């Protein structure tokens, strides 16, 4: 029996619910958190190995309280899954400064706060795995996702830098970059769409809204399969540092790697000529 303890944020819907259920099925003790504890309980169901705690990731005090409660209940935390997030869509000029900051607050500073609360316990244990759900939007940017991609690019840089800092204490890190899965990401529950304000963007905004609404619920990725594979990977002695989840995510990685190499080669002679002479 697996007696490891997993704490996950944003467990009340979508991928968070699926991961929590898969972890329970694999024998984990699960601390499932969310802003609405009743919604989390209803989504996951009953289990003696489930402990539901209130946690708004934008409130560091909530993170500290949730971690304390988890340790009091189970005595340890072996896996942290930073999953909670949202999506402020729109062209950069039409996303308000407040909404842009709110996007970064939830998707970047949220995981930072929860991880900051968990790491002292993991250092004490001299073991642990910190997982943050990123996105292919953290690998490549595109139109209409500037705020979201900014938050995910920040996550990527932070997690890459965190890895060597905590490795001496037996703590591993893992980034997950899902492609398009049939979750609630494009629904009104998860996505905030701006009011069209600038005529130059109006037609493209309308086209994007229409395309995304048609895509919602039709994505090819099965979140239940993702959750099962995810739990299998985190249960390994050597979980991957970065996991491209989905065939489309793998294609995104390959395209980005090709583009970076091409850019490096295109200006190699100029870039290599910038050292002091002599």
Specify the residue positions occupied by each region the protein language model found.
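The beta1-alpha1 cofactor-binding region of Rossmann-like NAD(H)/NADP(H)-dependent oxidoreductases
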Residues: 55-65, 97
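A glycine-rich helix->loop->beta "capping" turn
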Residues: 69-82, 88
């Amino acid at each position: 029996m697996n007696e490891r303890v997993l704490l996950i944020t944003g467990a009340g819907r979508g991928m968070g619910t699926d991961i929590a259920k898969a972890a329970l099925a694999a024998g984990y003790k699960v601390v499932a958190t969310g802003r609405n504890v009743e919604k989390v309980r209803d989504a996951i169901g009953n289990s003696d190995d489930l402990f539901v705690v209130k946690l708004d990731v934008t409130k560091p005090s909530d993170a500290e309280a949730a971690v304390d409660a988890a340790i009091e209940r189970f005595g340890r935390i072996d896996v942290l899954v930073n999953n909670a997030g949202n999506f402020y869509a729109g062209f950069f000029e039409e996303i308000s400064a407040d909404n842009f900051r709110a996007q970064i607050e939830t998707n970047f500073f949220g995981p930072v706060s929860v991880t900051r609360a968990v790491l002292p316990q993991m250092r004490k244990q001299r073991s642990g795995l910190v997982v943050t759900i990123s996105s292919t939007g953290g690998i490549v940017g595109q139109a209409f996702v500037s705020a979201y991609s900014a938050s995910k690019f920040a996550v990527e840089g932070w997690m890459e830098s965190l890895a060597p800092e905590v490795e001496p204490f037996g703590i591993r890190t893992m980034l997950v970059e899902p492609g398009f899965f049939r979750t609630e990401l494009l629904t009104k529950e998860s996505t905030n769409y701006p009011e069209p304000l600038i005529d130059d963007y109006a037609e493209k905004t309308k086209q994007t809204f229409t395309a995304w609404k048609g895509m919602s619920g039709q994505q090819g990725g099965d979140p239940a399969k993702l959750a099962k594979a995810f739990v299998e990977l985190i249960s390994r002695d050597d979980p991957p540092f970065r996991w491209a989840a989905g065939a489309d995510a793998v294609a995104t990685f390959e395209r980005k790697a090709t583009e970076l190499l091409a850019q490096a080669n295109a200006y190699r002679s100029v870039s290599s000529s910038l050292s002091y002479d002599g």
